[in-house]
């Protein structure tokens, strides 16, 4: 393993994530949401920063995920809050695809 591979962990199989969809998964004890948008893959924490709800149960509209509990909206690229009641941004994670594996870096 070279230095470029440090910190990367498997999040899901690429075939499990459909374009325009969100997939919730557990990675090393972290709840992660994976998104496939415009042939790119993004990763954020899967728990809304306003109240405990899985974003993977919400609605994905382009690059925006809406929380199913109180309709807070976040930009999946940056994690930025777009609409209240959330006031805290989501944590985002670097993503890469290696073969059929989606990998994220947690550090």
Locations of regions flagged by a protein language model:
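N-terminal pre-ligand scaffold of iron-sulfur
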Residues: 1-62, 75-76, 89-107
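Short cysteine clusters
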Residues: 48, 67-70
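Short cysteine/histidine-rich metal-coordination sites, predominantly Zn2+-binding motifs
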Residues: 62-68, 81-90
